[in-house]
C-alpha cells in the first residue's frame, strides 16, 4: 500500500467465478451456438446462461406460473429479455415499425417496454425466436451488443428537444463514445448474423480478454436538465456550451445506486467531479476511465466491483491522476453548471429550428394496446406518417421529434385518438418503476404492477392536504439492484419481500442527493400512513418552492446522506 491512496490499487485474492467464465468463453462465444439447437430445454445452460447477457439478453421465466409448472413437473417457462443498443434513445420510424411487428408476432407479452436507460426491451422471446430477433434488429441497422453484463452499457444523452443544435452535437458524442467502447469480438456477428469465422485472433484493446469487472454506465448530459440521472452512472460527460455551441465537457465519475440488503460494504454513491476537458480529448478520456476501472476494479467480489468502490478504495486523486496519465491530459477546473430539473416536458415544445417535438407520457414505459387506450397501435400509426424520428427518454417516455408545423394537427389527432395524450397529474408524470414481477428473476416485491394504484393513493394524499398540483419525485424498484433509480428519488421504495418495501426519504428534485432509509420492511399501508403525516407537514411548513425531499432534510425528519461510503447506513 502506498501512502498516496487509502487502499490497494488491485485487490488480490481468488477471482470470482464470473472471471473464469469470461476467460474460458473464447471472447464471449461459449457454446451459445450449439445451445441454440438444443430443443430439450427452453433455456440456455451452464455458462451460456450468463454469456448471453453480453449479447444483450437475460434468461427469465414467468414467475406468476413458476409454482404451477413445477407442480406439473415442467421446467420454468424460459423466455429471454432482449435490450437494444440505442445511444441517446434515438430510433427511426422505420426501425419502430420493425420492432412493433416483432413484439406482436414473436413475444409472449406482445409489448414494447421503454426503459429508463433510453432504449427498449422485448420480454418473452422464446428460444426459437432468439436468433431471428438479432437478425431483425440488424436488418434495420440496430443491435443488442453490450447492453448487459460487464461492458459499457447503452450510452445516455439528454433528450433536450428545444436546444436542437446542442442536442445534435451531444447526441453525436454519445454515439461516438458508444462505438469507441464497444467490444471488438466477432462473436456477436458469428452467432447471430451467420457471418463467417475469420482466422485472425480476437483482440479487445480497451475491454481486455475478461472485459470489465462489472457493468459500466455512461451519460452525456446537457444542463440544466438532469433527465438522465447522471449520479446513477459510472462516467458522465456534462456538456459545457458557449453561445449555444458545445465546447467541452465536465467529467464526473463513480456514481451508482445498486446495494445489497444488509451488506454495509455496499452503498449508493453520487458521482465525483474530476474536471473539465476540451472536446478533442473526449474519447481518450472515456477510454482512460474505462481501462483504469478495467485494471483496478475488484475482480474477487462482484458486490464490490463497480467504479464507485474502486474510487473509494484507491482515492479520488489517485484515480484521477491515472486517468490523466493514460489520456495524456491535465483536467482543467470544473466549469460552472447547474441543474434545475429532471422531468420531461410533456406535450408540445417548439425547438429553435422551428420544428415541434411532442413528448408523450408512457406510464412505466409499457407500450401495449390497453382496453380503450391502444397505445401500441397509436404509435405504429404515427410511425407510418412521421418523417422525423422517435426519441426514448430516461423517464421511460417517448418524444415524437422534429414534427413540421404542417404535420402537427395530424399527429396530435392520432395521439389523442389512441389515448396517448390523456391528461395525467404532475405526480404521475414524476413517478417511475422498474419491471420487477413477473419476469425479473431478482424481483423481491412488485414495482411496475404496483406503481399505478399506489400513485392513485399518493395523489389522494396530495389532494387531502390541499396541494393536488404538487409532485414528489417517487420511484419504486423491486430489489436493491435499483433499476428503478429509487436511490435518487425524494420518495424511494426498495422491494424487500412480497408486499414489503424499505422507504427512503431525503433525495431532492434534481437528483443530486442520495435518500436515506427512513423505515425498513414495511407494508403499503404503513408507507401511506407515513406519507400522509409527512406530506401534511410539508404542505403547512414548507418554504416557497421547497420540494418534499429538501423539506424532510430541513425539518430534521431525515439526516441527509453526505458521504455515502461512510454514512449511507448510519
Swiss-Prot record:
The UniProt note on the cofactor reads as follows: Binds 1 siroheme per subunit.
Q: Which residues bind [4Fe-4S] cluster?
A: 434, 440, 479, 483
Known cofactor(s): siroheme; [4Fe-4S] cluster
PROSITE patterns documented for this protein: NIR_SIR
| InterPro entries, sorted | CysI, NiRdtase/SiRdtase_haem-b_fer, Nit/Sulf_reduc_fer-like_dom_sf, NO2/SO3_Rdtase_4Fe4S_dom, NO2/SO3_Rdtase_4Fe4S_prot, NO2/SO3_Rdtase_4Fe4S_sf, NO2/SO3_Rdtase_FeS/sirohaem_BS
Q: In which pathway does it act?
A: Sulfur metabolism; hydrogen sulfide biosynthesis; hydrogen sulfide from sulfite (NADPH route): step 1/1
Task: Cite the binding residues for siroheme.
Answer: 483
Assigned GO CC terms: sulfite reductase complex (NADPH)
Tell whether Cell membrane is among the UniProt keywords.
Answer: no
Q: Which family does it belong to?
A: Belongs to the nitrite and sulfite reductase 4Fe-4S domain family.
Q: What is this protein called?
A: Sulfite reductase [NADPH] hemoprotein beta-component
What organism, scientifically named, is this protein from? Salmonella schwarzengrund (strain CVM19633)
Amino acid at each position: 500500500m502506498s501512502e498516496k491512496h487509502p487502499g490497494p490499487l488491485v485487490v488480490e485474492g481468488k477471482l470470482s467465478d464470473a472471471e473464469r467464465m469470461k476467460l474460458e468463453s473464447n471472447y464471449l462465444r461459449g457454446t451459445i451456438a450449439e445451445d441454440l439447437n438444443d430443443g430439450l430445454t427452453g433455456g440456455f445452460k451452464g455458462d451460456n446462461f450468463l454469456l448471453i447477457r453480453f449479447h444483450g439478453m437475460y434468461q427469465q421465466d414467468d414467475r406468476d406460473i413458476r409454482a404451477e409448472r413445477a407442480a406439473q413437473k415442467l421446467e420454468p417457462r424460459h423466455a429471454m429479455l432482449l435490450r437494444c443498443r440505442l445511444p441517446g434513445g434515438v430510433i427511426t420510424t422505420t426501425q419502430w415499425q420493425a420492432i412493433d411487428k416483432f413484439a406482436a408476432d414473436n413475444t409472449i407479452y406482445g409489448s414494447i417496454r421503454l426503459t429508463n436507460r433510453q432504449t427498449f426491451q422485448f420480454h418473452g422471446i422464446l428460444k426459437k425466436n432468439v436468433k431471428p430477433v438479432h437478425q431483425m434488429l440488424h436488418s434495420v441497422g440496430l443491435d443488442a451488443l453490450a447492453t448487459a453484463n460487464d461492458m459499457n452499457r447503452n450510452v445516455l444523452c439528454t433528450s433536450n428537444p428545444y436546444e436542437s443544435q446542442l442536442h445534435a452535437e451531444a447526441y453525436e458524442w454519445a454515439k461516438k463514445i458508444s462505438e469507441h467502447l464497444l467490444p471488438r469480438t466477432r462473436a456477436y456477428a458469428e452467432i447471430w448474423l451467420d457471418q463467417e469465422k475469420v482466422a485472425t485472433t480476437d483482440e479487445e484493446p480497451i475491454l481486455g480478454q475478461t472485459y470489465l469487472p462489472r457493468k459500466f454506465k455512461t451519460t452525456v448530459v446537457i444542463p440544466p436538465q438532469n433527465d438522465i440521472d447522471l449520479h446513477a452512472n459510472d462516467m458522465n460527460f456534462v456538456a459545457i456550451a458557449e453561445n449555444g455551441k458545445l465546447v467541452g465537457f465536465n467529467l464526473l465519475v463513480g456514481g451508482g445506486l445498486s446495494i445489497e440488503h444488509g451488506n454495509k460494504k455496499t452503498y449508493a454513491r453520487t458521482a465525483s467531479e474530476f474536471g473539465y476537458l476540451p472536446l478533442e480529448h473526449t474519447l481518450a478520456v472515456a477510454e482512460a476511465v474505462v481501462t483504469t476501472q478495467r485494471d483496478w476494479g475488484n475482480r474477487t467480489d462482484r458486490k464490490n466491483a463497480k467504479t464507485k468502490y474502486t474510487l473509494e478504495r484507491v482515492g479520488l486523486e489517485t484515480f484521477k491522476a491515472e486517468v490523466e496519465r493514460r489520456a495524456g491530459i491535465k483536467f482543467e477546473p470544473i466549469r460552472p453548471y447547474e441543474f434545475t430539473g429532471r422531468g420531461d416536458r410533456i406535450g408540445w415544445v417548439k425547438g429553435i429550428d422551428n420544428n415541434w417535438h411532442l413528448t408523450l407520457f408512457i406510464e412505466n414505459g409499457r407500450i401495449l394496446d390497453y382496453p380503450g387506450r391502444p397505445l401500441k397501435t397509436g404509435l405504429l400509426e404515427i410511425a407510418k406518417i412521421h418523417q422525423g424520428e422517435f426519441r426514448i427518454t430516461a423517464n421511460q417516455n417517448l418524444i415524437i421529434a422534429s414534427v413540421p408545423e404542417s404535420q402537427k394537427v395530424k399527429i396530435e389527432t392520432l395521439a389523442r385518438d389512441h389515448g396517448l395524450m390523456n391528461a395525467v397529474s404532475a405526480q404521475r408524470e414524476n413517478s417511475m418503476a422498474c419491471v420487477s414481477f413477473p419476469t425479473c428473476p431478482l424481483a423481491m416485491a412488485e414495482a411496475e404492477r404496483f406503481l399505478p394504484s399506489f400513485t392513485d393513493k399518493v395523489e389522494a394524499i396530495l389532494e387531502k392536504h390541499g396541494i393536488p398540483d404538487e409532485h414528489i419525485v417517487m420511484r419504486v424498484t423491486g430489489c436493491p439492484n435499483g433499476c428503478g433509480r429509487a436511490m435518487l428519488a425524494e420518495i424511494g421504495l426498495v422491494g424487500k419481500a412480497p408486499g414489503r418495501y424499505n422507504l427512503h426519504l431525503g433525495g431532492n428534485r434534481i437528483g443530486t442527493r442520495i435518500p436515506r432509509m427512513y423505515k425498513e420492511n414495511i407494508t403499503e399501508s404503513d408507507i401511506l400512513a407515513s406519507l400522509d403525516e409527512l406530506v401534511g407537514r410539508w404542505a403547512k411548513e414548507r418554504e416557497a418552492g421547497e420540494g418534499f425531499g429538501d423539506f424532510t432534510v430541513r425539518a430534521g425528519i431525515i439526516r441527509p446522506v453526505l458521504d455515502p461510503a461512510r454514512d449511507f447506513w448510519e
